[in-house]
């Protein structure tokens, strides 16, 4: 291996930044991910894959509630990516950043893409848990550019 660690090499791969959100009662749990990948893009059984830390409260909420949203952040939402990348208490549903659908999907206002998902499977034999989810609905705002994460920095394509 080169002088760079594998972690350094992989951090140089540019990725979109997403915020996973789960509703439980009057609370919204959220965390930032950069590991979102499509697994099946068919219209009848669209599936995505992502990873979360084993001790993730959001992961536990996904398994319990089954329904959640993945919000691909827009270029101007770096503040949300930073906020949700740290440990914090859940938000209350009434907070202005959320649009709640059917009491189970929390959409970030002005996200570039929103995927409403149902938990399908989990693979827990790795250092991080790998989640498979079925996409039940989706939307994209093509007028917004995505927020990108590369080499441990956020990149705003608008600047």
Where is each model-derived feature located?
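Basic, polyanion-binding surface patches
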Residues: 1-159
